[in-house]
Each structure stands twice: as C-alpha cells, then as structure tokens.
C-alpha cells in the first residue's frame, strides 16, 4: 500500500492539482474528472500492474486536521505528482510504501521531501535478493539501530513504518476514519483518445 502525507491545507492541495500543467489539456477536453466522493481506500491497496487509467484521492480527517492524505492506484504512489505538489505549495511530504509480504513486489520504503526536494530516503525491498539503501540525514523519529540488522528485510519493514508513523502522531489504522473532505481524480480517457 502506497500513501503520502502532506503538511498543507486541503484547499491549497486541491488548487495545486487543478493547476497542474500535466492535466491542463485533459481537463479542458473532459478526459479527467475531479470530484468530491466518499473515500474508498480499498481501491488503492495492491494496485494493478501495467498501463491503466490513473485514479487518486486526497482527503482530510478530523483526527489529523493539519494533514492531507493521498493514495493512488499506481504502484509508485504517483511520486512525481507528489513531489510537484510539495514544490508548488512549499510543504513537507512523507511517502510510504508499506508491505506485509503478500504482494508481488515486496518491500517497504520511506521518503521525506521538503518543498519538492528530497531530504531522506530509506528502502528495503526484494529483487533477486534483499536490497537496503538509505540517503539523507536521519529524522528525529528514526531508530538507526534498525538499519544495521543482519537481516536486510528487517531493517525497514511494516512494523518499523507503523512505529515511525506513530512517532509522527499518525495511526495507520485510522487515516481513513472521520473523513471531513475527500476529492478524487479519475482519468476516463487517454490524452491521445478522441
């Protein structure tokens, strides 16, 4: 499951999506929809592989008034779009990929950006063997002892990311509870389609 947390307000985030140059023609030609609708987080868990229409939602909850949550149906969590919004709004962005091991591409990642610039990256994932990589300065809530574990897959995993979220004041299990605002972007045609 990929999701992001932005430290900004809902209206500014929504405006940044509407003003994104990537979607200018698509919006004018009614090839994408941006609308209010109830959040269905299940649509974004274990998204499909390959080419498919993008869909993503952003929302606020009464539990976290100063945070915007974002999830998409793309495996990379729409990382380029997230960095664009962070840069445009001059806000902090945290991106997570949380996996328990049932997925085809098992691994966990954590990224922190500020104003669109990468500040911290930590990855532990399985290719033909386990890989661990980190870059940037440690954040105050990190436990660097985890990163020297002999078993690479234990250096960054589901439990560690849930712990880090908790230290950030976020409970992973209620990010979709008490939703106060939610917008969804949905592509209904490719730009090259008539």
Task: Give the ranges of each region predicted by the language model.
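A common structural junction motif
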Residues: 17-34, 88-93
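Charged interaction segments
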Residues: 40-194
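Aromatic-residue detector
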Residues: 8-9, 26, 36-37, 53, ...
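Short, extreme N-terminal segment that most often corresponds to the first beta-strand
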Residues: 1-27
């Amino acid at each position: 499951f990929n999701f992001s947390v932005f430290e900004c307000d809902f209206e500014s985030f929504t405006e940044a999506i509407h003003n994104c140059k990537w979607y200018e023609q698509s919006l004018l030609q009614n090839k994408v929809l941006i609308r209010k609708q109830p959040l269905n987080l299940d649509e974004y868990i274990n998204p499909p592989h390959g080419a498919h229409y993008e869909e993503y939602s952003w929302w606020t909850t009464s539990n976290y008034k100063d945070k915007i949550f974002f999830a998409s149906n793309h495996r990379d969590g729409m990382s380029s779009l997230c960095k664009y919004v962070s840069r445009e709004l001059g806000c902090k962005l945290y991106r997570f990929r949380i996996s328990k091991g049932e997925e085809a591409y098992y691994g966990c990642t954590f990224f922190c950006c500020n104003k669109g610039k990468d500040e911290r990256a930590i990855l532990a994932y399985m290719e033909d063997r386990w890989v661990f990589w980190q870059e940037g300065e440690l954040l105050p809530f990190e436990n660097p002892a985890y990163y020297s574990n002999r078993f690479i897959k234990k250096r960054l995993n589901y439990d560690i990311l849930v712990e880090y979220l908790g230290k950030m004041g976020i409970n992973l299990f209620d990010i979709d509870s008490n939703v106060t605002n939610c917008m969804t972007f949905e592509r209904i045609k490719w730009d090259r389609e008539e």
